[in-house]
Amino acid sequence: MTPVSPLPPRHGLDAVRLRTPDDGPWTTMRDHLVARLPRVAPARIDAMLAGGLIVGRTGPLDPAEPFRPREFLWFHRDLPDEPPVPFAVDVLHHDDEIVVVDKPHFLATIPRGRHIVETALVRLRRELGLPELSPAHRLDRVTAGVLLFVVRRDRRGAYQTLFSNRRVHKTYEAVAPHDPAVPLPTTVRSRIVKERGVILARELPGPPNAETRVELLEHRDGAARYRLTPLTGRTHQLRLHMRGLGLPILGDRFYGTATGEPEDSALDDWTRPLQLLAATLEFPDPRTGTTRRFASRRTLQAFTDPAGWAAGPTPDREVSRSA
């Protein structure tokens, strides 16, 4: 059994956990850490060891500790400088089992890469005082809408299983060009492949592994609002399928560009957000079997306020980094 971290969360983040290998050429645990963590300067590792910031199961690691195989170590990572995302995470529902939120555009679900503190998970752990909170699923950083979190670690599996067993019904809304020549409603099926380390997913020949139902809800002035119902959960599936119909989602700097290449500003420019919203989430309660349904309160500005969307978003909160 994996031991529990002796370090409490900090800034809403769990400590990093490492397990040393069965053997190796290192004389000391410090030597192993220097080799294991190439992105951390050796001087920083020395400072962390001297300050007792790297711990094992019996306490802080001594800087001269001999290498030991199959040993667990914990430490808190240094936080990168992140521009605050000035948009609020709205709580739709909170009970002793789950937290359901309305995630804004531009906020990642979980810490990853350059986005650590400025994520929905870390914000909610800090703001709600829930150190074991974890997501049952994820939304892309640029997608807004309904996102489900589980309050306790021992209940996470029950909710994640609902998603893996396809017992969760999700609908999305998108704003894209209106083309009366595209027959709707329709079901799009294709094969989507996402390679590790490559930003864009691709549609390739072969047996379909992705399926989306596309319906037209309303249109005006050349733009339309669509309901998208994914029957599978491939990376960037909805964006690829809309592009394949000749209806790229507005604000899509990855799949909506004329060149087919992502724009340089795609990761950092908060103007003109992707017009994709996780609108509803419906699932059977794992305890009672009762159907639970949650709906986003957000709207897609490119349809409701085209001029405002073109001008860019207005920040709606101040973000603090206090513990």
Predicted regions mapped to residue ranges:
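RNA pseudouridine synthases
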Residues: M1-A323
